[in-house]
Curated annotation (Swiss-Prot):
Catalyzes the hydrolysis of nucleoside triphosphates and diphosphates in a calcium- or magnesium-dependent manner. Preferentially hydrolyzes nucleoside 5'-triphosphates, with substrate preference for UTP > GTP > CTP. Hydrolyzes ATP and nucleoside diphosphates only to a minor extent. This is Ectonucleoside triphosphate diphosphohydrolase 7. Its main location: membrane. It comes from Homo sapiens (Human). Its cofactor is Ca(2+); Mg(2+). Belongs to the GDA1/CD39 NTPase family.
Amino acid sequence: MARISFSYLCPASWYFTVPTVSPFLRQRVAFLGLFFISCLLLLMLIIDFRHWSASLPRDRQYERYLARVGELEATDTEDPNLNYGLVVDCGSSGSRIFVYFWPRHNGNPHDLLDIKQMRDRNSQPVVKKIKPGISAMADTPEHASDYLRPLLSFAAAHVPVKKHKETPLYILCTAGMRLLPERKQLAILADLVKDLPLEFDFLFSQSQAEVISGKQEGVYAWIGINFVLGRFDHEDESDAEATQELAAGRRRTVGILDMGGASLQIAYEVPTSTSVLPAKQEEAAKILLAEFNLGCDVQHTEHVYRVYVTTFLGFGGNFARQRYEDLVLNETLNKNRLLGQKTGLSPDNPFLDPCLPVGLTDVVERNSQVLHVRGRGDWVSCGAMLSPLLARSNTSQASLNGIYQSPIDFNNSEFYGFSEFFYCTEDVLRIGGRYHGPTFAKAAQDYCGMAWSVLTQRFKNGLFSSHADEHRLKYQCFKSAWMYQVLHEGFHFPYDYPNLRTAQLVYDREVQWTLGAILYKTRFLPLRDLRQEGVRQAHGSWFRLSFVYNHYLFFACILVVLLAIFLYLLRLRRIHHRQTRASAPLDLLWLEEVVPMMGVQVGP
């Protein structure tokens, strides 16, 4: 039986074909896609990293600004994470107690505690002063604890009761106690150690009540100033002026100059390596240098500092005036005896004092001797007369009174001048702040040359600072000349030295040496927090590091995925080539077949 087959022919427009994609074209597309995605990811990574690194200084600067603003607000005593500390400054004229607080340590062993002075509900510093000084208890040491009771009761009322047992108390005695015999010093301290723990629950032991030296007091003052200025924060480089470094990762600290009424003090950091000195100077340098570590771990040396600190008794502004008057009195009376003159013996024939304003009259009395003086306002001559009072030696490495002074790198240093350095430049001259020697000399010379009547009239008209009084007007000429001589002739500061600032406040607050004392005394406390939060610190370190390194991890993962896609496409390409070669004979066979027309019979 014959077989009949039919073939149905459709219009040509009904047929369609799918073009075969060239393997070469597909490979090019894959490579272009891979290159484009890689470039895009790299660009995003660069932009994000630049944004992150650029935002860090701004964030740190903003955080420091918020911290300074927060220091002026009332302390939140309800915060359980706050710790407290007390420092009693037992001075010569009175005693003061300062209350400090700080949050938990941030867990970084390279950072110091963030200690601030406590403020009450009215945002006022928590501090109290009593008079007289504790040295008044020299003959009745058994009443020393009674003497300090008002201060400690005041502090106990401000520190939360549940924090009393963990609040350290430090009683540090200064000049007044130093003048007492050691036997009386020990008797006063023994009474404090015995009686105070019976009444107050503060953390207090025998080692926390002591008489500190002038050197220690100067070191504490240096620590406090540099801490407030942020010079111990080595990772913060937002302040371009403050980031000049002494070594890698180490910010430049500032030196301090402080001239009071009776004494003068200087303190500044010196390099750890110094030149070889003669034997006598080497011994003097060891006495005047203090090396200490503010860090909580002795293994970390980024907070090791070597500071030169010296206190000069008798070189303060008021005491220097007394020494000057003694000098003038003795020289004038001796000259009168030798030459038969009567200078200064009566108001009609006064001694013409170059260190007083023009026309100002005064009387110098020593025992039964009297010297009448009248100002002639010669600032340059005044400085020349003050030069012998500096008691300098001929050696180049000696300052006032022939005392050794460590070299100062005036090209890479910065100093702050307090007390008389600020009063002399600001109270009447109104040029406080950044000090410029020639400008100060010109202003001081002009002031000294004015008549006393003109100065008093200007004072009545309110042209001087609100802190100025008649005593300041009277002795401004002398004190400005004395300050100038001490700075440039005594300490050898260049006349055009640009990095001295005179100040009364730092960031709108007075900085006491007690802040530096509690920073030093509590330097090991962060170890407690570090041990308690060891596990959390490890996790915190991972999250901090992942902020940066997750970008690289993500980028690496994308590259792995793209590589897998590329290998997969390459695999498909090879499979396609095999299938193409296998189907080639079938295609030839198919082309040899004949497609019969519809209705045509094919034989058997």
